Amino acid sequence: MAAQGFLLIATFLLVLMVLARPLGSGLARLINDIPLPGTAGVERILFRLPGVSDHEMNWKQYLCAILGLNMLGLAVLFFMLLGQHYLPLNPQQLPGLSWDLALNTAVSFVTNTNWQSYSGETTLSYFSQMAGLTVQNFLSAASGIAVIFALIRAFTRQSMSTLGNAWVDLLRITLWVLVPVALLIALFFIQQGALQNFQPYQAVNTVEGAQQLLPMGPVASQEAIKMLGTNGGGFFNANSSHPFENPTALTNFVQMLAIFLIPTALCFAFGEVTGDRRQGRMLLWAMSVIFVICVGVVMWAEVQGNPHLLALGADSSINMEGKESRFGVLVSSLFAVVTTAASCGAVIAMHDSFTALGGMVPMWLMQIGEVVFGGVGSGLYGMMLFVLLAVFIAGLMIGRTPEYLGKKIDVREMKLTALAILVTPTLVLMGAALAMMTDAGRSAMLNPGPHGFSEVLYAVSSAANNNGSAFAGLSANSPFWNCLLAFCMFVGRFGVIIPVMAIAGSLVSKKSQPASSGTLPTHGPLFVGLLIGTVLLVGALTFIPALALGPVAEYLS
């Protein structure tokens, strides 16, 4: 079993790096504001039609463009969900959503979280799935990538005030990266057996003679961007464990690759744009070390089995509860770590049925800010916050003004870095405390004791860090939970983007200092260790008391 797990992890990472390297070169061209071959004429036409200016923006203008697009998308999606019964492509005549569920869902998809307090096949029409959710899957992913584009430019430009043009970046990211790759993935999914139609639900007779209603819909097109954009919201309630979304072992492997593809490519692009590819490799090494350790822990915990079931005489020594038999425990463990290391949240197994330690690792990966590969754009700019913090700590230890890539890190940058890092832990801890203090929060818990608290902690951690996966034993479709999680998702997304853009605006105006004998090397194994230590100390220690009350207490009981 250990050899199989090692081979699975090694194969996954090897294929991932091979695919991400050329994509990283393409992203580097876009960051350097170099149009891809044959696209310049199309871009000019698309900008001329609505009269959008392609002049460079300062950080405030860039931020306002990103926020404006997302707020408009939030309003449109909210009203679309409220009135979906008036809109076309609704063969099942599904009614509009309640205001609190519509708000939660709109915020969820605009913030790239894709938390779902509903069952897709019984709640949303085809129009809502396509024109509402799928569109936001593209736009939220493009928004995250655009923010990291601006931050990378801040390190490579000197004595400037501009970071690029948000509309140009959003257009190029969507048209030349997300749409083509998602189209290829969608066609592959269709070839493998995923659904893509507009038919009404089909009544069929089962082998037992009973009648069953099979949901239909344009699944493959949404499934592709759901994974590529690290969105994670399933067309069906069972998400990627549903055979209509994820029909074969091959589609499952491609889904995992799609989740990590752009975050990995952005690391390669970062090294290429900064002129030192070792910087990108340093980030990948730090992420990969944490990732491999986490996968190993989850695999070990799930192979050991559930002690409570073993005590009752379970006929298997491994924990197969809540897992698809066609995928097995090792693949389910790898997928769980992939989807929570990134801000994806898609699942092929029920995380609520994992062992105490097996479920704690995905929760912890979210709580550290999803900086281990992370979401498209958000993972890298989240890790860059820890890089700046690690550089600052190292500067204090050696008595030098901290600097990174030649840019001095001053008080303003460190205040903004601390603010950005503290946003999500504050939301998680205060949100969990509020839920446990109120009857409305506690009434949603379907399990008592430490596991019930783990369900609450996981939900708030998932929302605040824009993941979207859940311990499904929490009945979250209530006004209290819909509003609480919507607030956590909104602030967790934009409460980090705003200080990140402010940091970019500060760094881009500085001159780049040449490296000297006293400059801290930020590309070697020493800095990789320092960065991992910073993530563990700052990102993880915050949650030790909460984890002790939940999964740790469950493990020891």
Curated annotation (Swiss-Prot):
Q: What keywords would UniProt list here?
A: Cell inner membrane, Cell membrane, Ion transport, Membrane, Potassium, Potassium transport, Transmembrane, Transmembrane helix, Transport
Query: Superkingdom, according to UniProt?
Result: Bacteria
The answer to whether UniProt assigns keyword Transferase to this entry is no
CC terms in the record's Gene Ontology section: plasma membrane
* One protein family per Pfam: KdpA
**An example molecular function term from Gene Ontology annotations:** P-type potassium transmembrane transporter activity
Q: Where are the transmembrane segments?
A: 5-25, 63-83, 132-152, 170-190, 253-273, 283-303, 329-349, 356-376, 379-399, 416-436, 484-504, 526-546
Q: Where in the cell is it found?
A: Cell inner membrane
Topology in the lipid bilayer: Multi-pass membrane protein
Task: Please verify whether the record's keywords include Cell membrane.
Answer: yes
Q: What is its main location?
A: membrane
Q: How does it assemble?
A: The system is composed of three essential subunits: KdpA, KdpB and KdpC.
Q: What does this protein do?
A: Part of the high-affinity ATP-driven potassium transport (or Kdp) system, which catalyzes the hydrolysis of ATP coupled with the electrogenic transport of potassium into the cytoplasm. This subunit binds the periplasmic potassium ions and delivers the ions to the membrane domain of KdpB through an intramembrane tunnel.
Which family does the similarity line name?
Belongs to the KdpA family.
Record HAMAP family: KdpA
- What is this protein's name? Potassium-transporting ATPase potassium-binding subunit
Source species of the chain: Escherichia coli O139:H28 (strain E24377A / ETEC)
Gene transcribed to yield this protein: kdpA
